[in-house]
């Protein structure tokens, strides 16, 4: 089972606010905590003390803190990749390498005596992970995570995301991607238009982003990149992540009948394996409600994303629930009862 995560940035907030956010995330089952230690511009001891205070509190809740770091900071802190005791003393669950070494160092780091996880960047599209694997790392301690992208239009395209993710899936490594809170206001840098991995996610509701990542089958863990997400977002994300089946938002037509509402919302839908190019068919509603009335109404022509129920004019198909995949003419035997919400239409391509 994958894990949900949040991000906190102690240098840009207060311990009291971070603590309250950790409590809220813990309430909804969040396990991972991402934080960034890419540069230290102020007093080193003060910054590290603030980080440790947050890490200690997260650990007290049973959460796992991943510290984002780059090779330059190893030099600034006078620590070495072959001695991770600094991060062990900090209480970190793992270290994420924002910029990697040569491959040999990463492999050696996975064999540290503290069991600290080493998380590497998944988004570069190079043979980086293949190189690390050639040095026989301890794969129990080797994880992958995508970047997030504060600059609008700089996030990953879907094809590149798949290409990169499959490199890690090939080795059965744990994978993580970031989603974007619409209510959060900051990240590790002053300028940010949200902090998501996929550019197409930037303006979507958080639950929709999560549904998409799950449906790709490529991502284990999902973290919110920016802070602080609202309680409603934390709740909706957890519900989407933990759902036994994917759900789609439906905007119903005015005037749908109670029987049609029952067909739509009181049933678990699955589509037939002999999939049509024109419709997704959930056939069991016609069996369950064969004795119910489905009179003709709203029999306009059908468009991609429309939700349909066959009316009594379709004989034995009466009560069958469908989703239109293409535009189609309506001969009066199909009721258009709703429509997949525009922002989730793209999810139809990912249903399996």
Language-model-detected regions and their locations in the chain:
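Glycine-rich, proline-tolerant flexible connector loops at the mouths of alpha/beta enzymes
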Residues: 31-54
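Short, acidic/polar
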Residues: 13-27, 76-86, 129-130, 205-212
């Amino acid at each position: 089972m994958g894990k949900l995560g949040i991000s906190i940035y102690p240098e840009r907030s207060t311990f009291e606010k971070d603590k309250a956010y950790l409590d809220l995330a813990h309430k909804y089952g969040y396990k991972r905590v991402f934080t960034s230690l890419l540069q230290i511009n102020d007093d080193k001891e003060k910054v590290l003390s603030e980080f440790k205070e947050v890490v200690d509190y997260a650990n007290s809740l049973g959460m796992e803190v991943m510290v984002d770091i780059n090779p330059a900071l190893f030099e600034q802190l006078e620590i070495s990749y072959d001695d991770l005791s600094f991060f062990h003393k900090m209480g970190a669950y793992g270290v994420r390498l924002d910029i990697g070494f040569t491959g040999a160092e990463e492999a050696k780091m996975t064999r540290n005596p503290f069991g600290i996880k080493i998380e590497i960047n998944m988004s570069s599209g190079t043979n980086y992970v293949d190189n690390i694997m050639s040095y026989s790392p301890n794969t129990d301690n080797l994880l992958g995570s995508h970047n997030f992208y504060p600059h609008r239009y700089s996030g990953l395209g879907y094809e590149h995301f798949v290409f990169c993710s499959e490199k890690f899936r090939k080795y059965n490594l744990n994978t993580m991607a970031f989603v974007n809170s619409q209510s959060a206001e900051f990240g590790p840098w002053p300028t940010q238009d949200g902090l998501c991995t996929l550019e197409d996610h930037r303006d979507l509701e958080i639950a929709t982003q999560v549904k998409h990542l799950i449906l790709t089958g490529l991502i284990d863990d999902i973290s919110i990149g920016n802070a602080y997400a609202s309680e409603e977002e934390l709740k909706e994300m957890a519900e989407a992540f933990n759902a036994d089946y994917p759900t789609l938002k439906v905007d119903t037509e005015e005037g749908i009948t109670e029987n049609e509402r029952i067909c739509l919302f009181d049933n678990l839908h699955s589509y037939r394996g002999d999939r049509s190019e024109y419709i997704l068919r959930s056939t069991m509603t016609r069996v369950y409600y064969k004795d119910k009335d489905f009179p003709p109404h709203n029999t306009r022509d059908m468009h991609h994303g429309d939700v349909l129920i066959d009316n009594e004019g379709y004989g034995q198909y009466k009560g069958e629930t469908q989703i239109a995949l293409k535009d189609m003419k309506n001969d009066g035997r199909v009721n258009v009862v709703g429509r997949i919400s525009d922002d989730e239409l793209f999810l139809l391509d990912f249903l399996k």
